[in-house]
Structure formats: C-alpha cells, structure tokens
Amino acid sequence: MGLTPMMRQYLEVKESCKDCILFFRLGDFYEMFFEDAKVASKELELVLTGRDCGLEERAPMCGIPYHAANTYIGRLVSAGYKIAICEQLEDPSASKGIVKRGIIKIITPGTYTDSSFLEENKNNYIMSFYLDDNMCAMSFADISTGEFNSTHSNFKEAVVLDEISKFAPREIVLEENIKESFIHTIKERFPNISISKIKEENFDYNIDNNLKEQFNNFNENEYETIVKKSANGLLYYIFHTQKNILSNINKIDYYSIVDYLTIDVNSRRNLEITENLREKTKKGSLLWVLDKTNTAMGGRQLRRWIEQPLINKNPIENRLNAVEELLNNISLQEDLKEDLKSIYDIERIVGKVASKSVNAKELISLKCSIGKVPYIKKYLSGFKSDLFLNMEQCIDTLEDIHKLLDKALLDNPSLSVKEGNIIKEGFNEEVDSLREAKSNGKKWIASLEQKEKEETGIKSLKVSYNKVFGYFIEITKANLNLVPEGRYIRKQTLSNAERYITPELKEMEEKILGAEEKLIDIEYKLFTEIRDFIEENIDRMQKTARIISDIDCLCSLATVALENNYIKPNINAKDEILIEEGRHPVVEKVIPKGEFISNDSLIDTKENQLILITGPNMAGKSTYMRQVALITIMAQIGSFVPAKKANISICDKIFTRIGASDDLAAGKSTFMVEMWEVSNILKNATSKSLVLLDEVGRGTSTYDGLSIAWSVIEYICNNKNLRCKTLFATHYHELTKLEDNIEGVKNYSVSVSELENEIVFLRKIIRGGADQSYGIEVAKLAGLPSPVINRAKEILQHIEGDKEENSLNIAPSKEYKSKDYIEVSKDTLNTKNNLGSEIKHDTLSETNTATIIEDESTKEHLSSNRKQINCRINDEKSIKKEVAVDSFQINFEYIKRDKIIEEIKNIDILNMTPMEGFNKLYDIINKTKDID
C-alpha cells in the first residue's frame, strides 16, 4: 500500500526543512503531520488526530485555521521552534491534479517580525559567527528594524560570550563543522538561544557582489575578509528564510569592540545592567531607572547606549552637554516629549514595508509619526549644543511622504489590504467612479426594498445579501400568502422564511459586485504603488528614525536627572574616579525616599589604587562597590549621575567578581568558578580598567583563601602593566596590614554603631580597616534562634582566647547534659602510639560530644595512663558511650587526617562524572594542605 499523492507531496516538502515544524496548507487550515503534529499538539494544546496516508497506520495530525496562524506561530517561535510555511501556489479550483505547494517563508526565533510577539523596547537580533584560525567575526541583524552590525577580533571564547551577552540574540548562525564544544559553551551560558547551522560555502559564495547589492555603503576594500564572510553568511540565512531581499537592511555598520566600554558577561549580570539577578526582568536594573523614553525606537536605542558605553571623551561630553541644555530649557524639553509621545515605531513599520506585510492602518501610523517631524526640527533649532545643532541639520522632515499618505489613504482604512476601503476620495478618478456606481447600486437596492414593501403590503420584506446567494428578497412564512403569484423566483427555503430573486435584482447585483470586485483590485494596486514609493525612501525614513530615537534617549536622561537630583559628571584625563556623596541609582529608587546613605569615593592609579574594604556582611560593601561601577557606566553613557560631585576618568573595561557564581550544574564548584573569574580579570584588565573584587578566596580554607587574596592584591598593585583602579572587599582583616607594605593600598571600612549589645549598620564608608566582622550579630539579624546566638558568642570568646595556640578549649553548652564525660589532654592525643586506632573521633557536633570505642586493650591502656587520661565511666557494659567534654583540648591535625581518610573511603567513584571526580580530588588536596 503506497503513500497518497498528497502525503508524498508533504514528505517531499518536509525533506527540505527537517529542522522546522511544517505548516502545510490544506484549504482553510494549516495541517501538521507525524512528529510535527505531536510536538505542535503538545505545545499548542491541540487535539491530536490521525489521517489516512496510504500506510498501515494513520498519520498523526493536528491543524489550525490559516486566519489564526499568527497566534500559534508566535507561541511556537517563543518556545524556540522554527516554522516553515507551505502555501498553495495555485487556485485549487483551477487545478486538475494535486495543488501545487511550496515553502514561502521560514519563521525562526531570530527572523520573527510579528510585533505582537516582539518586545517593543528590545531588538530581536539574529547573529552569525565565523571562525578562521585565530580570528573570528560576528554580525548582528534585526530584520524588523533593518540594523546590521559587524565586528571581528582575535578569537577568545570570553570575547564572543561578551558580545552575545551585549546583543542578546535569539538565534545564532554557525558554520556546520564548528566544534561542538564551542556550541556547548554557548548553550550552557545562554540556554534560550536557538542554534542554526549552514554550510561553509554559504559564507563564501559571491561574497562581494552579495554585499554590494544589499548595502548602500559597502566598500569591499574597507572590510577584512573574515568580516565579509560573517556578513555574507547572515545575509544568506536571512534570504533563505525570508525568500526575498529585505530593502530595510541597506547599511552595514562596522564597530570595533575596543571602541566601547567592555563589560564582560559576569559583570553585566552582577551589576544588573539591563535585568535583575533574580527574575531576569527589567525592573531593578540600571535600564529600569534610566528608561523614561516615549517611543519604542528610543527605548531600543537607550538599551544599546547602556549596553555599549562610550570610551571617547568628545561624544560623551556631547551627550552630557545636550542633557544639560534640556535641563536648562524645561519648556522646550516638554514640547519635545509631548510630540515624541505621538510617534509610532517608524523602524518596524518600515521593516514591514520591506517585507511587503504592512497594512494601511500601519501606514496611517507612519503618516501621523512623520507629521510630527517638522515640529521636532523646529524645537531643535532652539538649542545650541553641538549634538542638537547637528541633528537639526540632518533630520529629514519627509514632507513628500507625509503629503502622499495624507492625500491617498483614508484616516480609518480596512485592516486587510485586499478588502478595499483604503483609498481616500479624490485621489483616483476610477476609484471615485466605481464607488459611485457601487453607492448608486445600493441606493437602487434600498429603493427596490421600499417599492416591494408598498406593492405587496409586506412590511417585514427585506432585500439582503450574502456571499453564497448574492442579493435576494426575504419574506417570512407568515406573510407568504401576501406574495403575488409569479412575482418572484424562489431561490431558497428556510425554516421560517422564503428567499426570492428577480431578473432586475440579479442584473443590478452583477453591476454592484462587479464594481466592488474591480474597486478592491484597483485599491490594492494603488496601495502597492504607495508601498513601493515608501520602500524606495526607506533609507531616508531610517535616518530620521535614528535621530528621533537619539532625541528620545537624551530627553529620557534629562527627565531621570531632574527627577532624581543627578549632577553632570566631569570627564577627566587624570585616571581618577572622585565621587562626593555618591548614591546607588537603583537601590535609592527601591527604598523610601531620603533613606539611602551616600558615600564618597576616591580611586586612582597611584596612592589610592586599591581600596581595601572590610566590614560585616549586610553592611553595604557590595552595594558601595556596584555604586561606583554604575556611576562610571552612567557617565560614559552620557548620563548625569547620582552624586553631589563626580570626576570620572574614562575606563576601557569594567570587571566584577561579586556574589556567588556557582555553576554546579555544569560541574564547576564555587571556588573553581571564583578562581576562573579572578584569572580572567587579571589576564584582561589594564591600567585603564575598573575592577571590583568581593570576598576573593572565600570558597576554600581560611589560610588558602587569605593567601590567594593577599597575592592577588600584590599582583594588581605591583604589576606595572596592570595597576588598575580596584575596589577589594574582604573578611580577611589580616589584609589591612598591606596598606603599610604595598603602595596604593588604602583601608576603608563600613561604619557600625554598637548600642547595648546591638549593632546598627550605618552604611557609611570610612577611612581605616574594620576591627571585627560582626558575624554573630548578622546571624542574629537574620533570625537565628537565641540559644544558637548565645552559644556562638561563648564559642567565639574561647576561640579568640586560644587563637594563638594550636588548640581549642571550649566549655560545653549548659543546655546539653550527659552523665559521662572525658578529659583528654592535647599531649596525649598528639601521641598516636598511645591511643592507636582504639579511639575514633567523630566530627564535633552541635552538642560538642566525642565517641569512644572501648575494648579490653583500651581499658588496660587507659588505666596505665591515668595521669594523662582521667576517664570516669558509669556504665562499663556499654560498648559505645556518648560523653560530654568538660575541658576538651584536641589536636585538630589528627582529626583532620582521620576525617580525610574516612571521606576517601566513602567516595563512590563509579557513580561520579569526571568533573565531579576532579572537584572531589581538588577538595581533598586542599584539605591536606592544612595538615603538617
């Protein structure tokens, strides 16, 4: 039994899009079969049915109405799937055999343009990556807006990950033979990105001609070959999915990575630049604070400004001067903002023009938007700063386009461009004539209805229309006896009425419907001509849209500065960051107004190169460090900053090692990740960089951690090629001694007030190191039970009293009772031969107990050493006894060795991954380092 012709056709089409869900058009439905149907039915909550396909088993099938497809497509694309749209390419009624079908478009996460599923203030980027030896190139495009950016650099995974983090593409196009390990790295870090592969030849084919045809500004001699390959590969993929050349992608913008402030992946996350750490949403981020834009275009542009702060003084100061001028001209600023509120998303409307998917209502939105441009140009002429003057000279008012749209299109046209009711009266004579004929015909219909009512005496008689029968006379059954015999021709019988026609009615119907059909065709033709004219002028509209988005960004920064009492920073060349009464821009917005404690900062590359900050957890060290970084970023964006005064030197890179970055799911321990991040910073930071390091060394033993932190400080301060501006927060109070030994180290701490055994964090950074960590007080604030807090204080007193010795002398808690106890001297336990393996020590528990395993030899030995070991045992029959320690002095080297041996014995090597095994070995090696 063979496949049916339709199913053979389906499988042939499916062969060309194996990685897609195929929407196969059958009549008024898109049908999915086999595995596609199973996936779609699950994701879209559709009923899974079956269809005879010529095989023994029915083909799994589900379907959706074609007119509702966009909603379902959006859900699938949002879930990361690719959709191939297979349409009927001929009229089924005119086809003698099976209807010809073909794929007209492939919709992927990176090429989706439906505005209802795109974030209006965020680009939907697709990226291509090309690797050649030790060089790599990357291109980023947003086909909904027409942006196309390319760059290249020496290949480092960190560089690529940084750019991915910056642009946040939904999809990455790679050469099909690229190493799977690299793909794994990308997916591990960015699990929501879709990966697509194309052949090597698609990056190379007809490269210069393709780029010249696509980009108006392309000069083959200006670009490295690897950049051209990356761009060509991305253009191929866009054409392959969209099935046509998109005219809104008409300019390639090359950028150098070193032209912008580098903020690596971890720092973007830790500083919460565009999204918060917990929910991964905009609220609580720097973008959330700064975004007061009034247009979608401005929102996207501001995000780009924040993702790519500047490193050249002139453009930074141009933005700052423009913001300052807006603040000095509140009236003009308000006029600008009011007109910006009326501007729609010109970039994405123009993108729909390029893809031939724009409708008349969207062109009316375009008309309204560009109608505001002459007013904006007039407002710009009232400013004097260089940036605004340049904008005023460059902005195109697009008056010819506005005039055409205003003259041609109805103010409230049909949503569909193939239903008529688009063209305004007076624009085209033929349209006016057909509309009159259509109108006259309908007037004739109305007069016919009135005449028939009068002549028959049937007041309920009506002349109606539907698409199946056309025009007809309808009379209810209650009035059929009033119908004159032979007056009408019966057309249709209903349960409660009869429908009739007359020759005159059918004749007029042909005239009316003929006029309507012709009118729809002519209106559509005129609409496409208008659309084509706009497409020819896309470049002009895009330039104007970019200027509008820049104006919107500047107005947003001015609004935020005014609302939050920001000041204009001074951009200096002294390699110095000097901030007076600085505030964290986000934290001050989420706590009650006026409660944020401001702090001063002075960091340079000489006497104040490394600011060593000590103090308890929860006191505000991390907030303070992030505050300095965010103020620096804001200044380099061109924003005013939250401070009383700010002198900011331009940084080339910002690095952070703040907070837990555990990546246990990827087989990486806390300490391993921490050391990798520190290593990355030390290798890539320069003397122009700003580095934030928080609790370096915390993930390992105390002495290992202290040693590493100490060494890192020395390396940063003593390496002449580094000496970067650094904020270093630590719990290791021993490091405060480095101020006297290393040039550039300065001690600071968070001020704490002690009142009647209570502490108050004053959140103020003061000169000098902290003398204690207040860990127990923090635990108390966190809500630990009082018995635990009180016992911790007792233990701390003993530890601090014995800290100069290699022993602990800790009295038992009075809350725990036992009849049995043992006194063990330090010297006895140091003599391994005295006790051998007869005494086994459990890990010290919360009850401070030890365990003794007794046998006859042990008793005899203990008896002979009564001067060394005084032991009172109440129940000699007991083999295992719990004893409370009255005065317990114990050699920790012995316990550690015993614990490590036990830990090694318990390792289940057969059920470990290689990475888990490596981490366990690394952990054990660290533990043995503490044993002499």
Swiss-Prot record:
Any one cellular-component term (Gene Ontology): cytosol
Pfam families: MutS_I, MutS_II, MutS_III, MutS_IV, MutS_V
Domain of life: Bacteria
Residues binding ATP, per UniProt: 615-622
SMART domains: MUTSac (SM00534), MUTSd (SM00533)
GO MF term (any one): ATP binding
One GO term (biological process): mismatch repair
Keywords: ATP-binding, DNA damage, DNA repair, DNA-binding, Nucleotide-binding
Family membership noted in the UniProt record: Belongs to the DNA mismatch repair MutS family.
Function statement: This protein is involved in the repair of mismatches in DNA. It is possible that it carries out the mismatch recognition step. This protein has a weak ATPase activity.
Protein name as catalogued: DNA mismatch repair protein MutS
